[in-house]
Amino acid sequence: MNLFQRVKYNFEESIKTKTAAIELLVDPIVQAGELMAQCLLNEHKILSCGNGGSAADAQHFSSEMLNRFETERPSFPALALTTDASTVTAIANDYSYAEVFSKQIAGLGSTGDILLAISTSGHSKNILQAITAAHIRGMNVVALTGRDGGELFTLLGTDDIEIRVPAESTARIQETHALIIHCLCDIIDRKLIPSSEDH
């Protein structure tokens, strides 16, 4: 396979993954978007976390909330727990990397808030501890996962929502997570900003 064929292959595999996800994920995406919109309407906030590319996804979501998505609107309260290098490195140094998100949630999370937890594998210890911390604080969890959901799946409660991409490839999962994040932003805007219905 030459490089031109490889690029075409990657596009085709990404399309296949998204196509397979349509029937499986529309319902949980809508449920999660509505849950997030209600959270914001009730004057609560959304915290997000992930590692590596998933950390970038967490920041992507929070930036769309704080700035705007495709509609002019007020800022919505959202915070990526991945961005404060001083806090993350202090917790990792003094305690452990597994606690870099959970300790922030213990200080920042409140009942009625939502945690957006992003993990392609579902096995990241700091994400697992973040979910446990969120539950202790009375928060609901929206989890973006892939593969078989990993250990993360076993921690979710009946009021939590998992959006699991039906793929094994980390790249394909992350590409679909980006689309899911845009879908969530679109739902939130349409629920909270009537003028967004026109776009």
From Swiss-Prot:
InterPro entries: GmhA/DiaA, Phosphoheptose_Isoase, SIS_dom, SIS_dom_sf, SIS_GmhA/DiaA_subfam. This is Phosphoheptose isomerase. Keywords: Carbohydrate metabolism, Cytoplasm, Isomerase, Metal-binding, Zinc. Substrate binds at residues 51-53, 64, 93-94, 119-121, 124, 174. Homotetramer. Zn(2+) binds at residues 60, 64, 174, 182. It comes from Coxiella burnetii (strain RSA 493 / Nine Mile phase I). The reaction produces a racemic mixture of D-glycero-alpha-D-manno-heptose 7-phosphate and D-glycero-beta-D-manno-heptose 7-phosphate. Its EC number is 5.3.1.28. Belongs to the SIS family. GmhA subfamily. The gene is gmhA. It catalyses: 2 D-sedoheptulose 7-phosphate = D-glycero-alpha-D-manno-heptose 7-phosphate + D-glycero-beta-D-manno-heptose 7-phosphate.
